[in-house]
């Protein structure tokens, strides 16, 4: 809700991102840690995309969505970390008004797309395990492209609408955001005008981007587990579980981190806790994803090996 009691209303040209620490001596350490994780995220996800695109054996629905998930993870991390690194390097906390809205839009869009792709990948595993005879028709290239397009539309439109609604909000002279990125809830706390519509939009996006994909994932894995336990052969069970083990690991890490923070009692809320949660699902998990999908997957390891061999041959 807006704060009608505030009368010091002004046209805001920029905001201040307070970052993760107020201590100057900690800034070089934070810069090194986040630069390292960002580079690992970008290189790891780029290698997955190159390995999948260069190996014809990986031109399947599962790896098609994995390549798009890797691209989404790279874009999601790039929406916030480079600006944080630039602010630390220049010893500045400023982000322009337009830059803040642009960052918010990309974070919402790619964050929502990440969730949507995780749900689609769970459905892909459900069809592969529970309906193997219909897999080629149920997950045809045309349908995969359609599902990807639907995910882009479903995440882009609400993110754009929320960002446009923020342009109608009047902000007060106070413009400090206690995060390393433009958090929508923190932005609304700086508003001087009514924000009921914006808050309703945040709730709607939470349901659309988090709750609906999670329900689809849970439904898919309930059906998968039921189908796997019917299999009498231990080898068959292991093969079925191995096809979705990496995806399930990523899902548990991502949603587990969110629930571990946001389902705690409101009395324990703090900006520090929310910042740590943001670091976990915006930086650490995208950094781990390439390792999870490559180290636990024989086909990916073989494709990466071929990619490195071809790279050495090219440079030699």
UniProtKB/Swiss-Prot annotation:
PROSITE patterns: G_PROTEIN_RECEP_F1_1, G_PROTEIN_RECEP_F1_2. GO terms for cellular component: plasma membrane. Glycans are attached at residue 8. Residues 50-60, 122-145, 221-243, 296-316 are cytoplasmic. Keywords: Disulfide bond, G-protein coupled receptor, Glycoprotein, Membrane, Olfaction, Receptor, Sensory transduction, Transducer, Transmembrane, Transmembrane helix. Odorant receptor. This is Olfactory receptor 1N2. It comes from Homo sapiens. The gene is OR1N2.
């Amino acid at each position: 809700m807006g704060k009608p009691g505030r009368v010091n209303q002004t046209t805001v040209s920029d905001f201040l991102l307070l970052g993760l620490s107020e201590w100057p001596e900690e800034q070089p350490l934070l810069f090194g840690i986040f630069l390292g994780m960002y580079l690992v995220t970008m290189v790891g996800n780029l290698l997955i995309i190159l390995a999948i695109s260069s190996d014809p054996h990986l031109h399947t629905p599962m790896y098609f969505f994995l390549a798009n998930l890797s691209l989404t993870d790279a874009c999601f991390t790039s929406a916030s970390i480079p600006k944080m690194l630039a602010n630390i390097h220049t010893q500045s906390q400023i982000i322009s008004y337009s830059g803040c809205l642009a960052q918010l839009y990309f974070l919402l869009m790619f964050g929502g797309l990440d969730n949507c792709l995780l749900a689609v990948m769970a459905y892909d595993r459900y069809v592969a395990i529970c309906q193997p005879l219909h897999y080629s028709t149920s997950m045809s290239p045309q349908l995969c492209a359609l599902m990807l397009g639907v995910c882009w539309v479903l995440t882009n439109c609400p993110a754009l609408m929320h960002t446009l609604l923020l342009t109608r909000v009047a902000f007060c002279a106070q413009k400090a955001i206690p995060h390393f990125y433009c958090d929508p809830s923190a932005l609304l706390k700086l508003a001087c005008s009514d924000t009921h519509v914006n808050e309703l939009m945040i709730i709607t996006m939470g349901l659309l981007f988090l709750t609906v994909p999670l329900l689809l994932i849970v439904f898919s894995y309930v059906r998968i587990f039921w189908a796997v336990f019917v299999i009498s052969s231990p080898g068959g069970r292991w093969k079925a579980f191995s096809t979705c083990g990496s995806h399930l690991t990523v899902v548990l890490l991502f949603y587990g981190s969110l629930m571990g923070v946001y389902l705690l009692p409101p009395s324990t809320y703090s900006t520090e806790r929310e910042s740590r949660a943001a670091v976990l699902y915006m930086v650490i998990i995208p950094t781990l994803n390439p390792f999870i999908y490559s180290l636990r997957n024989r086909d990916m390891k073989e494709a990466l090996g071929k990619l490195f061999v071809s790279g050495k041959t090219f440079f030699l």
